[in-house]
Amino acid sequence: MGLLIDGNWSTAWYDTEKTDGKFVREDAGFRHWITADGAAGPTGKAGFKAVSGRYHLYVSHACPWAHRTMIFRHLKALDAHISVSVVHPLMLDNGWSFATDEFATGDTLYKSDFLYQIYQKSKPDATGRVTVPVLWDKQTEQIVSNESSEIIRMFNSTFDAITGNRLDFWPAASRNACLLYTSD
């Protein structure tokens, strides 16, 4: 698993000596929010209004963080409103690839070969790991978020007026308990 350094792909791997061989997940690099009216969310900038068909989700079926966004997409009836591309589950030297076979859909938006190219499209000088899930804004051609816990919170209520689905998986009275299961 490589990374982007100043917008250039590098095949450098995790330095596991610094972490005693443990995987340490980096903080997400894109933390904007989709809101019902397009106002800024808890982090990031404004301009991401909930609109049917405007957003795209990049996932891997091999990633549990991406998997939970797919579960929420289905539970909140967003399948017809947020399109999806599935990367190949095997991550090699170029990171997540957009192979097209029984395990992956390919990049249905831009026909990219690798997910890092989506990060470069969003931020040409990006530095950091290229991770899934990625919530993409097709209108502004940029990453809204790559933080799964925030993506599922957006999916929980932001599109309710569009879908009519008012199921609430993040009720105010239970949020502290929910954090035990949704925090990374």
Task: Give, region by region, the residue ranges found by the protein language model.
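Non-catalytic, surface beta->alpha helical segment in thiol-disulfide oxidoreductase systems
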Residues: 141-154
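Local sequence-structure signature of Cys/Sec-based thiol-disulfide redox active-site neighborhoods
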Residues: 47-90
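Conserved small/polar residues in nucleotide/adenosyl-binding loops
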Residues: 181-184
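Short, polar/flexible loop-turn hinges at active-site or ligand-entry regions and domain interfaces
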Residues: 142-143, 161-169
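Charged, often glycine-rich, active-site loop that binds/positions anionic groups
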Residues: 90-108
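A generic secondary-structure signal for well-formed alpha-helical elements
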Residues: 70, 76-78, 122-123, 139, ...
